[in-house]
């Protein structure tokens, strides 16, 4: 789904599971053995430790913390186990996870390119699980290992990851690796400033394709999220955006994902697009509306469709809307219930006015 969306939007990439590259494999499922290796290496370096606490103890711990009004978090119970105790439990096959050993004192500072320095007290940060009991890594470990081995220099992600970043910085320190530059982008918001979620909004990019938004329109609209050219320009191509983009100019105000604005932007690109190409893109929507039997049209039919699209694209926000608005070009009998109702009301009103004037003289009518 992600690959399909990127290809549709012409967002090319030089490495990945489907194109290869020098730093593969690119699927975490194919890098599974790496994570266990590096987790145990971190234990040997003193940056992590084995935790043998079972579910019952952890649940009791959470209940006690809740009763005392404390934030939930691991209490470091296994952090002080002796080497002999650890070896004994490992030999006995006691299930374990591997946790990050966060410093108890001091601060961790995130040097964020957009936000400046963000400071966290180490004592308030939990000892994060890095490797689960089933041998699978958590995001925190896999993310750091992969980014290091793949030579990642810049991590650009949503601001919701800021609270996790101190753990990531400590992981880089524990491994002795250079941390990348962190850039945390503002989250997209609904009109009411709430966070966009899958439960409330269509967040799949392919959904917008199926609804009839042009890729040029959607890319343009997304390029306006938290970013401005400065001269008021709102309509641009992907290449223009690439040529002018400066990440230091991204604003942090939480851009609003406004479907009305998206519709306007998309309409601008519909009017700019070559009429023949726009017609070809609209044909599947004509088929979906039942106006065409299939997408195979003759040259003569295509020329007719071009004329229809040329007229209707002026006011349509999407290809789907354009097709719906073209109904009267394809049907013999056409009526709009709301128009019919308004017309009948107008006739009734006129009829009443005439009745009121039945006994009026010409002078009285003129006075009115």
Roles of regions detected by a PLM:
Residues 26-34, 187-192:
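Short, conserved secondary-structure transition motifs
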Residues 33, 72-73, 231-234:
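Short amphipathic alpha-helical segments at helix boundaries and their inter-helical linkers
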Residues 1-8, 58, 66-69, 224, ...:
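Charge-rich, well-structured scaffold segments of protease-associated domains
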Residues 41-184, 189-198, 204, 229, ...:
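Active-site cores that bind ATP or allylic diphosphates and position pyrophosphate for catalysis
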């Amino acid at each position: 789904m992600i690959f399909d969306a990127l290809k549709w939007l012409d967002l090319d990439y030089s490495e990945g599971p489907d194109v290869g590259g020098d730093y593969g494999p690119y699927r975490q499922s194919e890098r599974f053995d790496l994570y266990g290796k590096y987790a145990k290496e971190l234990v040997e370096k003193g940056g992590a430790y084995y935790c043998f606490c079972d579910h019952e103890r952890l649940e009791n711990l959470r209940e006690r913390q809740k009763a005392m009004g404390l934030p939930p978090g691991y209490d470091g119970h296994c952090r002080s186990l002796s080497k002999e105790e650890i070896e004994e439990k490992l030999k006995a096959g006691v299930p374990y996870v591997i946790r990050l050993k966060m410093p108890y004192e001091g601060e961790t500072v995130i040097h964020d390119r957009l936000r400046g320095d963000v400071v966290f007290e180490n004592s308030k940060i939990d000892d994060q699980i890095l490797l689960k009991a089933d041998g699978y890594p958590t995001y925190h470990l896999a993310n750091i290992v992969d980014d290091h081995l793949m030579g990642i220099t810049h991590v650009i992600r949503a601001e919701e990851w800021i609270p996790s970043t101190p753990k990531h910085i400590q992981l880089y320190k524990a491994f002795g690796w250079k941390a990348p530059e962190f850039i945390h982008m503002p989250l997209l918001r609904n009109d009411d400033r709430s966070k966009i979620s899958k439960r409330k909004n269509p967040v799949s990019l392919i959904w917008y394709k199926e609804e009839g938004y042009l890729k040029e329109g959607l890319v343009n609209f997304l390029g306006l999220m938290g970013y401005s050219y400065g001269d008021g320009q709102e309509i641009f191509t992907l290449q223009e955006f690439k040529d002018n983009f400066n990440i230091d100019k991204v604003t942090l105000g939480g851009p609003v994902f406004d479907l009305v604005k998206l519709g306007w932007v998309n309409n601008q690109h519909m009017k700019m697009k070559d009429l023949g190409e726009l017609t070809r893109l609209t044909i599947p929507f004509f088929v979906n509306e039942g106006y065409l039997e299939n997408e195979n049209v003759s040259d003569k039919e295509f020329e007719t469709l071009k004329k229809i699209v040329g007229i209707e694209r002026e006011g349509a926000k999407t290809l789907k809307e354009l097709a719906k608005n073209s109904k009267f070009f394809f049907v013999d009998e056409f009526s709009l219930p709301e128009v019919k109702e308004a017309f009948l009301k107008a006739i009734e009103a006129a009829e009443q006015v005439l009745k009121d004037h039945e006994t009026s003289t010409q002078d009285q009518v003129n006075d009115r």
